[in-house]
From Swiss-Prot:
Catalysed transformations (reactions): 4-amino-2-methyl-5-(diphosphooxymethyl)pyrimidine + H2O = 4-amino-2-methyl-5-(phosphooxymethyl)pyrimidine + phosphate + H(+)
Catalytic EC class: hydrolase
Name listed for the protein in its UniProt record: HMP-PP phosphatase
Lineage of source species: Bacteria, Pseudomonadati, Pseudomonadota, Gammaproteobacteria, Enterobacterales
Organism: Salmonella arizonae (strain ATCC BAA-731 / CDC346-86 / RSK2980)
InterPro entries in the cross-refs: Cof, HAD-like_sf, HAD-SF_hydro_IIB, HAD_sf, HMP-PP_phosphatase
Name of the gene this protein is made from: cof
Length: 272
């Protein structure tokens, strides 16, 4: 039986309205009662995740910023990695040929250059929000990640520009169809989970993980049991064809799967 369960948030543990369902919260509590370590592995900021954890009364490790930070149960930093300052400076100051909006994250929060109220819908549960600022004024040596938000086709074109300019100095991934992330080289949820599991005296084989987007690929592919959401990006399902696909986040499929796993561990699981 797995000893650690790692969960992506958006599109996985959270429902489409960006909230946790009652069944999901109850199932997470059951996991803790079985002494299974909980880990939330997300692109969201630790400041936001601490607020969410506080409303749940659950002990969980946090992998935030898509693997750029790991925090202990007590809130201590176990691991941190920032973008190479030259990479951050280039991305923030270059005139990219795109209509996508740029978002910069550091330990102080989420920063963008203009008001985009629609993006706050994903954060109604926590109240976390961006700060509007001149992005070029942000110190390049304190940036954990940079995101671009826009339609998928424009982000694909932007990814080509970023790859040509940055070459092999950063890790690019889609955390959603409308969000392209620029991360430190070698930084992802999978590598962060490897650091955390080693810290806990576990192996990745002792872990299970759930996810729906390409920023979950390394994590899902490296654990003992990786589960893909039924609402996942098609690219993720194609990249990991050997993994099981469960139900939709809107149906609290993670809770559905885990309830079966806890109650009938030796019986095959049938998705909703």
């Amino acid at each position: 039986m797995a000893r650690l369960a790692a969960f992506d948030m958006d599109g996985t543990l959270l429902m489409p309205d960006h909230q946790l369902g009652r069944e999901t919260i109850a199932t997470l509590s059951r996991l803790r009662e079985r002494d299974i370590t909980l880990t939330f592995a997300t692109g969201r900021h630790v400041l936001e995740m601490r607020h969410i954890l506080g409303t749940l009364s659950l002990d969980a490790y946090l992998i935030t910023g898509n693997g750029t930070r790991i925090h202990s149960l007590e809130g201590d930093v176990l691991y941190r990695q920032d973008l190479d300052p030259q990479v951050a400076d280039t991305v923030m100051h270059h005139a990219w040929d795109t209509g996508a909006s740029m978002h910069v994250f550091n330990d102080n929060g989420w920063f963008t250059g203009q008001e985009i109220p629609a993006l706050l819908q994903a954060h109604v549960y926590s109240g976390f929000r961006y700060q509007v600022i001149d992005i070029k004024s942000i110190p390049a040596h304190q940036v954990m990640k940079i995101c671009f938000c826009g339609d998928h086709d424009s982000l694909i074109r932007l990814r080509i520009q970023l790859n040509e300019t940055l070459e092999e100095r950063a890790h690019l991934c889609f955390s959603a169809v409308d969000c392209l992330e620029v991360l430190p080289l070698g930084c992802n949820k999978g590598s962060a989970l490897a650091v955390l599991s080693d810290h806990l005296g576990l192996s990745l084989a002792d872990c299970m993980a759930f996810g729906d987007a390409m920023n979950d690929r390394e994590m899902l592919g490296s654990v003992g049991q990786g589960l893909i959401m039924g609402n996942a990006m098609p690219q993720l399902i194609a990249a990991l064809p050997h993994l099981s696909v469960i139900g939709h986040c809107g149906h609290q499929a993670v809770s559905h799967f885990l309830t079966h796993w806890l109650d009938n561990p030796h019986l095959p699981y049938s998705p909703e």
